[in-house]
């Protein structure tokens, strides 16, 4: 699975692995990325997202995908998620 996310803002972090003898070797810490289908109540369909587990908890705390996408800034979203957020805003405005 690619370590790219559509929600959550997580990216691999680099640093040093330090042994007992203090020898340092470079390594990467990968985020816990999952592919999920989250239900959008406003759109009436599921949206497939690649999301970090911490962002998945944030979506749950916000009360669902719709509220989460409307709450965060569009600059923090990928183009595909911006499109979904725009569709949600348009549907809510029409209703």
UniProtKB/Swiss-Prot annotation:
Pfam families: Ribosomal_L28
A Gene Ontology biological process term: translation
SUPFAM superfamilies to which the protein is assigned, alphabetical: L28p-like
Gene3D superfamilies hit by this protein: Ribosomal protein L28/L24 (2.30.170.40)
InterPro entries: Ribosomal_bL28, Ribosomal_bL28/bL31-like_sf, Ribosomal_bL28_bact-type, Ribosomal_bL28_sf
GO cellular component terms, semicolon-separated: ribonucleoprotein complex; ribosome
Chain positions covered by the region annotation Disordered: 1-28
Gene Ontology MF terms: structural constituent of ribosome
Keyword vocabulary terms for this entry: Ribonucleoprotein, Ribosomal protein
Family, per entry: Belongs to the bacterial ribosomal protein bL28 family.
Database matches in HAMAP family: Ribosomal_bL28 (MF_00373)
Protein name as annotated: Large ribosomal subunit protein bL28
Organism (species): Magnetococcus marinus (strain ATCC BAA-1437 / JCM 17883 / MC-1)
């Amino acid at each position: 699975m690619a370590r790219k996310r559509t929600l959550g803002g997580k990216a691999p972090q680099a640093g040093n692995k330090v042994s007992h003898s203090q020898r340092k070797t470079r390594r990467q810490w990968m985020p816990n990325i999952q592919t999920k289908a989250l239900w959008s109540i406003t759109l009436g369909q599921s949206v497939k997202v690649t999301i970090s587990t911490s962002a998945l908890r944030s979506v749950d705390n916000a009360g669902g995908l719709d509220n989460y996408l409307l709450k965060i800034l569009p600059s923090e979203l990928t183009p595909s998620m911006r499109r979904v957020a725009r569709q949600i805003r348009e549907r809510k405005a029409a209703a």
